[in-house]
């Protein structure tokens, strides 16, 4: 079966016989999926250094080559694309008309490690993780790390000075807000767990605690990694891990796993009703229909 059910609660979210459909393949390592207003999926082929587009009628095309080995992507509340780039250690914003603006490159006088994944809050704040993977061979541009920590940052609405929210992760990676944005979930690939924080004014974080632990082996060769993470409209947390996409209830119960044939890098919601999970996994992109919609973010109109 495509879905391993650990709790009856999972059956409300997805059919245990739901098809995990491969919609495209032949890539190097897929990441950063984001559903666009024209009914297409943009995603990164990170080691291949390309950004690609999939459309159900037009197939796969190349959008940017080279892509600065971009990784996580999202859209802001105005529909602009927000992109994490490994080669440039940057977070950039691209308008639908092609205008490109660099939003963050440094913390103080030191270059960011390699921005990895990114979300946008309702007030327009941009929150991103900054592990070191983009300084490793294959994943970005091999070079020495300038910072002595791996953090989570905030770019204020309208710009302004970069704010460091937390700096005690080994390798921060996927992140998502709770439905009311009172909580921020951030996973740590190296420690194979998810932490959750209370969110205060200006997205200051407090009361960090474990939400789910011992998720996989943190082994890059095995692809057994905690990586991308998203939320549904009921507050359940979806995270990549062993065998596919693990689903956790808001109180941290592992409800089950949507099994995917290849190691998964990320996931995101798409289609007009936001009830399809699009899942980049190694050399391919998959999708599965759900019974629940994704948590509605600003761009999900």
Predicted regions mapped to residue ranges:
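Blade-level signature of beta-propeller repeat domains, shared across WD40, Kelch, NHL, RCC1
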Residues: 268-301
